[in-house]
Amino acid sequence: MTRLLPRWFVERIAPVRDEDELPVSTLELFFDLIFVFTVAQFTAIIAHDPAEGLLQTVLMFGFLWWMYAGYSWLTNVIPPVRPARRILLLCAMAGWLVVALTIPAAFESGSVWIAIGMLVVVLVHGLMYLQAARAFGPVFVANLAAVAAVFAAELGPAGAWRYGFWALAAAIVWSVPVWHGQRGLNLHPAHITERHGLVVIVALGESVVAIGIGARGLPVDADLLVAAVLGLAIGACLWWSLFVRDLPGTEHALKATTDQVKRVRKVLAGLSYAFIPVLVGILVFAAGLKHAVGHALSPLDFESALLLSGGVAAFMLGTAGLRWSMRLPRPWERVALAAAVLAVAPLGLVNTALQLAAVVVVLVGALALEGRASAAPRPAPAE
């Protein structure tokens, strides 16, 4: 497919060696700021209607996360060091902004603009990859097919039709690793790990924003301060659970995996697939926190209590998937931790602060036990 592109556009990209530094650029950080807005839109949808909003979020997030993670892979393989690449990334940011702006309308009135935004995102992504990777052609076609499904969803009637085509879009892109294989990519372990970690940091920022939004117009009293501080404590525990041991262990495991195909498979399983419950869990928790702020001394409704505990539990299940994929120690401990966090959800029906405090106690206790059991992750076997 690179033969269809002008010669001046196609270039040979030399992969960066594992031992050489490939820091995340400021342009990539700027690019990630769009994700802040995207996360905020999904959080608002879930907070407004937990059941239907969560279904809509999962369907849209399936396709959007595939493409967003795709840009992390893109800048890993083709660093944005030339002006042309930087301009293309900025054009992609415009597409992502259009997508984020139109997320609330996607399942309500329908908006062809979200499909147009995704088309821009996919075209820029594909053209940049095709500069250097001819094998990307079939993936590009699959991404375009997913965009076509989004056009069909937004131009068709509301209801089952729209849900069905969004599900089809997600199914198309996530089937790619099954039939295309994982050859032709050389991923830099430190960069790909840091890039995905930064996306989680951005998403965790939404939980802090949720505190501010929930507190808007409320008096600064014990109700507000207790819920805010406990909510921040939970966010801190989520950060600790991923960044203190698991992500450093992930980078080490990827460096130890010298076979590039096996490395790509680990990144797919651990940083792409497993990060879906990690990120959606943060969105769900933030939506529940919006309802909790300002009502710490009152009971929560069932849906809000489930959002608070369910979001944290989903996050922990995602970290279990990461540990399993990277062969890090004790993934099943995180499954047990997710169950324990869910078990305290009924406390919110009695008192909001009681549930928040119970979640904090469960998380801190589990993380303390993990820290005592292993001060550092065991090295993954070289492959």
Over which residues does each language-model region extend?
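Predominantly late transmembrane helices and immediately cytosolic-facing juxtamembrane segments
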Residues: 1-25, 29, 34, 48, ...
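Transmembrane helix-boundary motif of multi-pass solute transporters/channels
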Residues: 30-55
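Short hydrophobic/alpha-helical segments at membrane-entry points of transmembrane helices
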Residues: 52, 110-111, 356
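Loop-to-transmembrane alpha-helix initiation sites
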Residues: 160-165, 351-361
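Long, low-complexity C-terminal extensions of enzymes
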Residues: 330, 334-342, 346-358
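Cytosolic/matrix-facing juxtamembrane and C-terminal tails of multi-pass cellular membrane proteins
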Residues: 380-383
